[in-house]
Structures are given as C-alpha cells and as structure tokens.
C-alpha cells in the first residue's frame, strides 16, 4: 500500500507573493548595480559560492529530512529521477539555442568601423541568452512554489536563498548585455522583464501544488531536491570556479551553509 503524507501547512497567497517579489526586486537591483559599477570577478565568485552554500543548506536541513522521514523510496526515486532528467534536458536545450544564436551572429558580424573612437553598435536582443535565463528563473519560481508546498518555513528560507542567487544572475546578465552594446537603461529593463518569470513560476507552483498531499507531495519534493542540487553543483559552483579559487572564496560557501543551518535551527 502506498504511503500517505500529512498535508503541509502553506502560508496565505499574499505571503507567498511577497516572498516571490523579493528575489525579483533584488535581481533588478543587481542589474542596476552592475550598469552603475560592475563588481569584480572575485566578488561575483564570492556571491556565487555563498549562494551555493545557502541553497545547499536549505536542501540538507529543511527538504531532505522531510523526504527521508516518510520512507517512500519509490516516490522519491520517481521524483528525483524526473528532476534530474528535466534539468539535463533544459540544459541541453538552452545550450543548443545559445550555440545556434552565436553561430548566426558570427555569420552576420558587420565589418569593423574605420573610426578609431567608434562605439560598438547596439546589438539585437540576445534571444538565446534571454530564453535560457527565462527558463532558469521560471524553474526557480517553480522551486519556490515547491518550497512553500513543503511548509512556510521551508518556503521562506528558500526564498531568501534564491534571492542571493538571483542577485548574482542579475549582475551577470546586465554585464553581458552591456558588453553586447545595450544601453544602461535597456539592460536593466531587459533584466526586469526576465525577472517576471519568477512570479510566473511561483504562481504556477503554488497554484498546482497548494494542498498537495501524500505521494504527490513526496514526488514533488524529491523533484525539487534534485533540481536544487543540480542548481548548486552544475550552475552556481561551476560558474564560481571560473575564477581562480582562493581560501576566502571557498570559505564563502561554508559561511552560507552555516548561516542558514543556524537560521533554520532558531527560526
């Protein structure tokens, strides 16, 4: 007989909306900061390490114990497998889209200007990059909905963790848009537009999963577990390690983990 799990206590819609707005606003603020004074690679690597530690802490301290406690191995295997397959499939799709766009831009590159002080022309929108970022943020929103499906505490901590991640994403996206020749205001506006995908994802997640119980909830939490682990190991830490590793950068990961471990204990 399949195991049933008690219903998680989910917070009101207004609370979930507020916690969904927080990461989106911080992402826009990160973009504004980047166009005003772009942070150095060391600082961005430190933010990525810290965000990875925070999310890993939420996974290990909040989600994983809830999943293990209910002893539903088949549901866990199904949800976890679906999570890994989904993240791998999305990465394959977005990488192909970005490569296709890069090939098109290389073939249509304009001849260099003869003027010594000529500014780079404003590029068309990098749709491959924006679609990849939009999907990434949409998944973050879904994960936030999954977090609140597990409970108010789990959702709140995950919202704070994703806020740190999206700060880094806002910084990186704005910097890349500026390097492509987009103006400061346009770069921030593009980031603001993509940040709306977080609200869409969170809305879908909370609508579909609100009141989820039993085996469905266990599958969903296991899916979120796999997706968050993928986010930490294959995105945040991979990007963080593009910068030469130092003891202080490594320490940022453990500071983030310890901080949210303690926060989870006292909250």
Residue ranges: model-predicted function:
Residues 1-267:
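Intrinsically disordered, metal-sensing/regulatory segments
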